[in-house]
Amino acid sequence: LPREWRDQPVGRDRGMAIEESQSLLIEMIVCRSRPFVRYLMPLLQKHFGVSGPEWDPENVYAHLTRVRRSLIRVDADELTYPLHIQLRYDLEKQLLAGALAVRELPEAWAEFMQARFNVRPARQQEGCLQDIHWAVGSFGYFPSYALGAAIAAQLFEKLRGDVPALDEQIARGEFAGLFGWLREKVHGLGAKVSTQELLKLATGKPLTATASLRYLEGKYLEDPASRSAAA
């Protein structure tokens, strides 16, 4: 964030959707990519002495992008994660509208998981007590994760277009191009403009789901890792 705006309202981040987008862009898009795995593997071999076919870069990538049902939101993959957010969003709306009593929440949660994931939590720690958000009063926060993922995909798509050598840079452990673009297009604006205006300035268009769908289809359908490696 701009130093000259520090301690001013305009010097804050734009909001939680943008903040989550920055986390997810690095955590999910960059760090679970083939270029990053190429950068990571020599470090693992040097510092931890890993070897063998299970440490083949494509096999590691397959594990990082494995899709499977999970009871726990923070352990979920990119494809099933939105369903975890939908669950919380739907139940949260029902709670606030008075359509769902707090005592009914555990069973409503379990029914959703059974219907959408074909798994059922055995205890409440795997269900409605796994997150701290409601306990600390953070109602309305969960959609920030879904919005953040969509924003991250849209930003990254434009970033790759603006920095054609980005994949090669990441594979070499050179992140100046990545973070330089983000600082200029996102961080440097602080809270000066709205979220939609920030996206228009950075990508040329307001937020849509198009880039997110294109990213997921490309990664998991058009150019997937060898799933047998991650079995």
Language model regions located:
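C-terminal, non-catalytic "cap/extension" segments appended to globular domains
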Residues: 85, 89-231
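Acidic/His metal-coordination segments adjacent to aromatic residues that form catalytic metal sites
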Residues: 4-8, 12, 66-72, 127-137
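Active-site-adjacent bridging/hinge elements
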Residues: 1-3, 57-66, 121-128
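A conserved active-site cap/scaffold subdomain adjacent to cofactor or substrate pockets
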Residues: 9-100
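Surface-exposed helix-capping loop/turn segments at secondary-structure junctions
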Residues: 2-4, 34-36, 161-165
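Catalytic Zn2+-binding segment of zinc metalloproteases
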Residues: 1-6, 26
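Flexible loop/turn segments at secondary-structure boundaries
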Residues: 3-5, 12-14, 32-33, 153, ...
